[in-house]
């Protein structure tokens, strides 16, 4: 059954309004009101990328931390919250991630292009993601969660 992404609460918790009208900024958060929640990597905006079925952007991103193709496929097929639980930190020391057996420098243009291509695939294939993104036209989009250290 499809979750109601325009709801104001989920699992007994109120979703938060992540829009700041003073700065015209929307903070993308899974616990935010629509469209913030649908733009989150944790949202189940399924797409197919490079022959892999990805149930969420989080699944794709977490899969990059694993060298083994079978493990990547498994993580790609997970929805956001479950995929996030598969996170590992071993890649951080040498800043190498993996895609389909190929090592990629996390700080490289090749990595940036891979991420752009995955987001483009999700945009093209997920009407819900596209519609939510179009709702933010003219807004500044941020993600003020996580670590500030890019390494």
Regions found by a protein language model. Give the residues of each.
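Charged, low-complexity intrinsically disordered segments
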Residues: 1-151
């Amino acid at each position: 059954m499809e979750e109601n992404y325009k709801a104001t609460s989920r699992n007994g918790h109120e979703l938060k309004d992540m829009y700041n009208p003073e700065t015209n900024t929307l903070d993308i958060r899974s616990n935010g009101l629509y469209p913030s929640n649908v733009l989150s990597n944790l949202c189940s905006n399924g797409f197919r990328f490079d022959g892999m079925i990805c149930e969420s952007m989080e699944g794709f991103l977490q899969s990059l931390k694993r060298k083994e193709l079978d493990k990547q496929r498994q993580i790609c097929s997970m929805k956001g919250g479950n995929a996030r639980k598969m996170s590992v930190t071993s890649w951080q020391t040498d800043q190498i991630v993996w895609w389909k057996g190929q090592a990629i420098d996390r700080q490289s243009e090749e990595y940036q292009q891979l991420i752009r291509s995955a987001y483009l695939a999700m945009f093209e294939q997920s009407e819900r993601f596209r519609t939510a993104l179009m709702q933010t036209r003219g807004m500044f989009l941020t993600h003020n969660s996580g670590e500030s250290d890019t390494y």
